[in-house]
Amino acid sequence: MKPRPGVFVDRKLKQRVIQYLSSNRCGKYVDTGILASDLQRLYSVDYGRRKRNAFRIQVEKVFSIISSEKELKNLKELEDGHLAKRARQDEEDEYTESYSDDDSNMEDYPDPQSANPMNSSLLSLYRRGNSESVSTTPKWGQREATTSTPLLTSKTGSVPLKTPARESEGGWFIDKTPGGKKESLPLDLSDDQSNSKKQDSEIQILKDSSLLESDKKRKGRAKGKGNKRKTENLQEVDGEIEALLQKKAKARSTELQISNVKFEDVGGNDATLKEVCKMLIHMRHPEVYQHLGVVPPRGVLLHGPPGCGKTLLAHAIAGELDLPILKVAAPEIVSGVSGESEQKLRELFDQAVSNAPCIVFIDEIDAITPKREVASKDMERRIVAQLLTCMDDLNNVAATARVLVIGATNRPDSLDPALRRAGRFDREVCLGIPDEAARERILQTLCRKLRLPETFNFCHLAHLTPGFVGADLMALCREAAMCAVNRVLMKQQAQQKKKPEIEGLPSEGDQEERLGAEPTSETQDELQRLLGLLRDQDPLSEEQMQGLCIELNDFIVALAEVQPSAKREGFVTVPNVTWADIGALEDIRDELIMAILAPVRNPDQFRTLGLGTPAGILLAGPPGCGKTLLAKAVANESGLNFISVKGPELLNMYVGESERAVRQVFQRAKNSAPCVIFFDEVDALCPRRSDRETGASVRVVNQLLTEMDGLETRQQVFILAATNRPDIIDPAILRPGRLDKTLFVGLPPPADRVAILKTITKNGTKPPLDEDVNLETIANDLRCNCYTGADLTALVREASLCALRQEITAQKNGVGAGELKVSHKHFEDAFKKVKPSISIKDQVMYEALQRSLSQ
C-alpha cells in the first residue's frame, strides 16, 4: 500500500521511525503515543517545539505506511517462494502426463506476471491439494484405457480413437465421452488399488518434502547471512543512539570538581575571609545547629565589580572545607525548550543533595534571576520561581544534607528581591575595589612564585596602582614578566652585535638582507628587531638565565600597557598628581587634609571625639583655578580610591534612570570604601528647585540628598564637589551633614602667581628660560591681574611656541642654530595673544559671591 498522492510523508521522520522500531525499544506491540513522545525527546531540536497531538497523528500515518509496505514485502516473498517450488517440482517430475493433463495444468495455473498477487497466492494453495489427485490418476486411467481399447476401435480396425476426455472438479472425475454408445465404467476401489495409490502419494510427498528441505537449507544459509548483517547494522544503530543519549545526559549533568585553592591564595580580603569563616561553621559542625533546632544558612551571595575575586573566593571556600563543588554558569541553565530550564535547575539541586556535603556555585546568577515585575518573558519568571522553590526545598531536607549555595554577580540590585530574603541568599559578601594596603597583600600573594629581587618594593608598586583589582594585578604581573623577557633578549642581542662574527653563523648584514630592506624609521627598526628575536631559536644559557628576574622598572613599564577594569567602571587613576604639582592654595590644602586625610590616617582619634560621618566639601570659584587638580591631589596623597562623576553624564531621558545612576555611584563607593566621590560641575545635578518644577532634575536632587544624608550611613565615603555657580545650587545640599563646608578657590594673588609659574616651569628648567626672564616680574605685571592658573599655563605654552617659531625661521634662513631658550621677548609676544578668561565684570561677581559664602 503506497501513500496517496495528496499525503505528505516526511522521509526523515519515516527513517527515524524505522530506526526506532528496529532498535527493539517498543517491544512486540507499538504504542504510537509513546513512540511520538520518545521521538520528540530524542530529536528535540527538530520535533521539540511541535504540538503533541499533531505530531502523534503524523507518526501514526508514517507507521501505517511502514506497516503496509512491510505486509506487501512479506506477501511478495511468499509468492516468489511458491513459484520457485512449483518450478522445481515441474523439473523433477518423473511421470509423463497426458495431453489432457497438460491442458488442464495450463488452464489451472495462470501467468504469475499478469495475475493479482493475492489471487495467485490463493490459487496456488488451492491447486496444491488438487495436484495430488491429478498426479495419482495416470495409473487408474491407463488401466481403464487398456480394458476399453478393444471396444473403442474403428471399424477399419487400424487407427485407435482418442481416449475419452475427462474433467476433474474438486477431486471428482466426469466422463465426457462424445457420442455413440456409452459404457458404464466400474469404479473399482479395491484394497490393492487404494494401497498402490497411497504408496504413490507417499512417494510424491517424500519427494516434495526433500525438495522443500533442501530449498529451506539454501534459503536458511542466505537468510542467516542477511540476518547477521542486519543484526550488525542494528547493533551499530543502537550503539550510536546509546552514545548520543549518554552524550546528552553527560552534557546535561554537571561534573563535581575538587578545588585546590585555599584561603591563603586569596590576598587582601582579611575582613571578608573573617566574615566567611563565621558563616561556614555549620558545614563543619552541623550537629550544633541540629541540637539547637536551627536551620543553618543555605545561600551566600558574592557581589562586586568584575575581577575582584568572587569566583576565586568560591573555589577557596570549597578547597578550605575540602568539599566537592558543582560549578555552573547561569546562562548554561537557560534553554530554548519550554520547561527544560526548570528541569535543569531541579536536576542540579537533586545532584547536589545526592552528593552532599557539597557546594553549588552559580556564576553570573543575575542572568537567570531578574526582577519578575520587569521580566519580559514568562520563562524568566518561571526560572526565578523554580530557583526559589529549590532553595526552600533545601531547608526542608534533613540537616544531614549539607549543601551550600553560592551565587556571584556584578549587579546585585538587578536580582529579584525574593531571592535575597532570609532562608535563601540571606548572607551577602561584598568584594570591593582593594585599597593600597590590600593591593600590597594581593601583589605579595601573586608574586610568591615569581622570581623577584630581594629588595622589591611592594608598597611603592601598590601606591602606583589605584583602582586595580586582583585580575588587573595578575595581568600586570604577566605583562611585567613579558617586559623582563624582552629586556633580557634585547640585552643578549646587543651583546651579540659587539662580538666578532663566529664561523658558521650568518653575520648581521646577512640577517638584514634576509629580513628585508634596511629600516627607514624607528617603527620599522623595532619591527625588524622583534622579527629577529622570533626567528632566533638559540636558547638562553644557564648563565644568562641565572641573573634573570622581574624588576620594579618592568612593572612600571607594564603599567602603561595594562588598563584597569575599574577605570571602565568610573574609577580614575591619578598616580602623577601630587601637592608639588599645585602652586599656592596652602590654606585650601590644609582644609582638605583635615576633612579627608585625617579621618583615614587617624581613625581612633576621630572615634574618640565622636566624629562619625565625614564632611562633604564644595570647591567653588571661577573656572581654571585648580579645583579638579586639588581633588586629584587629595585622592593621590591619601591613597584612596577615586570616582570622578561628571554631572551631565548621570542625566538620562528615561524616567528613573538618572536616580538609579546616582544610587549606583554611591553603592560603588561603599563597596570600595574608603573612597572619594568627586562631582564635577555639580550645579548640573543639583539646580535650585522651585514650587512649579516637578521634572527629572527634582528627582535627581532628591536622590542625591537622600544618598548624602539619608537613613543609610556612608562610612569612609568622602564627597568632593566643584562648581562655577554655587548661587544656582539647591540650598538643601549645602546644609551641614552634606556639603557643609564650602572652600572658595578664587583668582590667585601676585604671590600665588609666582608659585604657580615656578610650578609650571619646574623652576625655570622646563621649558628652559633665558637669563632675562624674571618670573616675579611677570607675575606682578598688571596684565596678569585677572589670570587664573589655566591662563598662566597658556601664557608659558605660548611663549614656548614663540621661541620654537623663531628657531624654525632661523634654520630656514641658514643662521646657525643656537641653544633653544624662552626669553623675555617671547613672553611679551605671548601677552599679546593670551587674554584673561575672567573679565572684570565676572571678577566683581565672584568677589561678591565669596563674601556671601564667608558670612
Swiss-Prot record:
It is found in: Nucleus, Nucleolus; Nucleus, Nucleoplasm. The keyword Iron does not apply. There is a cross-link at K207 (Glycyl lysine isopeptide (Lys-Gly) (interchain with G-Cter in SUMO2)). Residues 266-473 are annotated as: Interaction with WDR74. It comes from the Eukaryota. GO terms for cellular component: nuclear exosome (RNase complex); nucleolus; nucleoplasm; nucleus; telomerase holoenzyme complex. A motif (Nucleolar localization signal) lies at residues 49-52. Residues 90-110 have a biased composition (Acidic residues). The modification Phosphoserine is found at S133, S190, S210, S214. Residues 113-123, 131-157 have a biased composition (Polar residues). Gene3D superfamilies: 1.10.10.2010, 1.10.8.60, P-loop containing nucleotide triphosphate hydrolases. SUPFAM superfamilies: P-loop containing nucleoside triphosphate hydrolases (SSF52540). Keywords: Acetylation, ATP-binding, Isopeptide bond, Nucleotide-binding, Nucleus, Phosphoprotein, Repeat, Ribosome biogenesis, Ubl conjugation. InterPro entries: AAA+_ATPase, AAA_ATPase_domain, AAA_lid_3, ATPase_AAA_core, ATPase_AAA_CS, NLV2_N_sf, NVL2_nucleolin-bd, P-loop_NTPase. ATP binds at residues 304-311, 621-628. One of its GO terms (molecular function) is preribosome binding. Participates in the assembly of the telomerase holoenzyme and effecting of telomerase activity via its interaction with TERT. Involved in both early and late stages of the pre-rRNA processing pathways. Spatiotemporally regulates 60S ribosomal subunit biogenesis in the nucleolus. Catalyzes the release of specific assembly factors, such as WDR74, from pre-60S ribosomal particles through the ATPase activity. Belongs to the AAA ATPase family. Interacts with NCL/nucleolin. Isoform 1 and isoform 2 interact with TERT and isoform 1 exhibits a higher binding affinity for TERT compared to isoform 2. Isoform 1 interacts with MTREX in an ATP-dependent manner; the interaction is required to associate NVL with nuclear RNA exosome. Isoform 1 interacts with RPL5 in an ATP-dependent manner. Interacts with WDR74 (through WDR repeats); the interaction is independent of RNA or pre-60S ribosome particles. PANTHER family: AAA-FAMILY ATPASE, NUCLEAR VALOSIN-CONTAINING PROTEIN-LIKE. This is Nuclear valosin-containing protein-like. It comes from Mus musculus (Mouse). The lineage of its organism: Eukaryota, Metazoa, Chordata, Craniata, Vertebrata. The gene is Nvl.
